[in-house]
Amino acid sequence: MGSRGSFVDIDKGDFTFVEGGQTFRKVAMVDDVVVLERFEGGVKAPDYSHSADRIYAVIQTQKAKNKKTGEYETVTRLKQLAFYDKNHDQKISVDFGHPHTGVRPHIHIDRIHDKNVPGIPPTKEQLELANKIIRRLKLDAY
């Protein structure tokens, strides 16, 4: 799976990958959702999808402190759901990793990440899809 901006020329419809630009790995499918894993760095869904009208779920395995025991443990969590349009462009992303103006999870529209815009909670359908992915893949809660 290509990284952000790793396609040859999206303006000309060339969605082949740039050499060395693959930073996501497809790990599963849940219904029509492609589940990708990012192994290092920040977790943001790709700006563009390889397929039109696609939904990606991005997960990441990392060390996290257990709130009850204080010990660090390995957890795998859903970090983002990303929805793409017919032009392969990301239209909505649901961010589970951190709060935005106090709202967690929250959505971003058209890849706009403006700290001055109030956080928008995900829809009921988006949360149901996230919870289905978490259940099916036995992920840790977000």
Model-derived features: positions:
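Catalytic toxin/effector domains delivered as secreted proteins or via bacterial secretion systems
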Residues: 7-142
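Non-Sec secretion/translocation targeting segments of pathogen effectors
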Residues: 1-4
